[in-house]
C-alpha cells in the first residue's frame, strides 16, 4: 500500500489527548498534528523521536498534518490504525494467507453478534462463512517478538468472545494481527498488560478460532505486508 500523500520528516515533542501531538519540523517550526491512533502507542511516544507526517489539503480538517510513522529502535513503525484493514486485504490478495484461499466474495464491515461489526466476511458457495477480525500491532519489548495488546482492551476481549460464538455456530472465525513493523520474527499475547485478554485468547484457541500474524515493511513510500510470522502462545 503506497501512501497517497507524500510524507514529511519531523521530530516528536509530545503526544497528548490521544489524538494530538506537538511536533517540530526541520525548520524548527512547532505545530500540532492529528494522531490516527486511539491506543496507548506504548514505546512510540519518546520525545525527539524521528517521525513522518502526511499533509492533507482539506479545509474541513482542523489539523492539516497527520502522524503516520514513528522511528523506534532504528525501525520505522506505522501508527495509523485506519490502515490494517487495507493491509489485511492486500495480504489476502497477495496470497500471504493461503489458509483463506478459495473464497469468492469478501464483504467489509458486516454486522454480527451483539452490536458488533466484523472487519471482513468471506463467503463461498461451498466453503463455510469465514469471519475475519483485524487487530493492529506495533509493540515490541523483546527483540524480534511483537506483542498485543499494549494496554487493557475490553473491546478486543469482546471481539474474541464474539468469534468463539461464530465457531460454535459451525462457521470459521479468524483473528489476524497486522504488525506495522518489520523487525520481528514471532508474535505473542501480552498477558501482563491485559491478563483478561490473555485468558480469552486461550479459550478462543481451544474453541477453534484461528489466529494468524503478518508483519509489514514500513517506509516513507508506503506500508506493505510481507510475510506471516509464527504465533507463540507464551504463558
Curated annotation (Swiss-Prot):
It comes from the Bacteria. One of its GO terms (molecular function) is DNA binding. It holds the Pfam family SfsA_N. Belongs to the SfsA family. PANTHER family: SUGAR FERMENTATION STIMULATION PROTEIN A. This is Sugar fermentation stimulation protein homolog.
